[in-house]
Amino acid sequence: MAWTPLLLLFLSHCTGSLSQAVLTQPSSLSASPGASASLTCTLCSGINVGTYRIYWYQQKPGSPPQYLLRYKSDSDKQQGSGVPSRFSGSKDASANAGILLISGLQSEDEADYYCMIWHSSAS
């Protein structure tokens, strides 16, 4: 049985001022069911990924975005209610990026994926 490649789309956003953190994402990614996909959310220069929580959302056509997870560190992360563990977060400090890893891709994972950052001075 031949598998149709899975297409994952991303939002690119790189506008704003220094008072607003700015993110960029690749426009699309293709992968096959059963494979893994790594989605990146790169912060613009001058904004350190280490100080931010990265939030990930999935949106399917005709539906509102659904919260997947947030990730700041291994000790500061949260999985959305009912979100399978095959969705996980991490960071790449050298690339100044947050990462959403989806393992064991399934056809229902075809969607738009959005990242958002949140910075809190509270510990």
From Swiss-Prot:
Subunit and partners: Immunoglobulins are composed of two identical heavy chains and two identical light chains; disulfide-linked.
Region (Framework-2): 54-70
Protein name: Immunoglobulin lambda variable 5-45
Organism listed in the record: Homo sapiens (Human)
Chain spans, region Framework-3: 78-115
Region Complementarity-determining-1, annotated ranges: 45-53
Gene name of this polypeptide: IGLV5-45
Region (Disordered): 68-92
Region (Framework-1): 20-44
UniProt domain Ig-like: residue ranges: 20-123
Region (Complementarity-determining-2): 71-77
Polar residues bias spans: 78-92
Leader sequence segment: 1-19
Subcellular location: Secreted; Cell membrane
Function: V region of the variable domain of immunoglobulin light chains that participates in the antigen recognition. Immunoglobulins, also known as antibodies, are membrane-bound or secreted glycoproteins produced by B lymphocytes. In the recognition phase of humoral immunity, the membrane-bound immunoglobulins serve as receptors which, upon binding of a specific antigen, trigger the clonal expansion and differentiation of B lymphocytes into immunoglobulins-secreting plasma cells.
Taxon lineage: Eukaryota, Metazoa, Chordata, Craniata, Vertebrata
GO cellular component terms given for this protein: extracellular region; immunoglobulin complex; plasma membrane
Pfam families, alphabetized: V-set
BP-aspect Gene Ontology terms: adaptive immune response; immune response
Disulfides per UniProt: C41-C115
